[in-house]
Amino acid sequence: MRADVKCAFDVAFWFADTALEQNEYLQPQKLQRLLFLAQGYYAVLHNGRKLMPAVFVADELGPMEPNIYAGFSRGRPNIDVELFIPHEIDGYLTSLWRRFGHASMERLNQITKGTSAYKQARAKGARTEITLDAMRLSFVRAENTPGVQQVVKPKVFVTQTGKPVQVKAWIRVRKIPNQKNSHLYQFIRSCSWGSACAFP
């Protein structure tokens, strides 16, 4: 099955770099849970497509991608990854980070270990593969997980009474003063080119 990102390390490095930029310590197990959530929610949003070519297994600690785990076992690996991932995927990962990036390890364990995909694979034995279809079904049903719309919906700003408001980027506009009442306008009008003027 085709994946939309070249390798799972691209996504792992994205999370690691984002955590570093925000002075957030990213535990190796937390990285594993974020990768699992990223793959599962992406499959829901894109009709079963993979975000990254990754295989998750049901470890006793929680869902884990063994290649990423081995790669990060002694710190950040020195490998070449894509410097820039596609804009749509960057936006998706940003939404996911906003929702789960600052969550505690306990909360992420509760969410991921509570999915039927993890439970079914774990019941078959340690380190059993968690299929993408099982992950997608778990996240579609939103069992012990936030619904996909809660994860990727755009942020809505509200007033203190709870009414939604539309927020636009602020653009500084230079206002021209009321010409009839402006001292500056009168001053400029009274000066002619080349003559000395004193402000009243």
Residues covered by each model-derived region:
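Domain-edge interaction signal
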Residues: 1-200
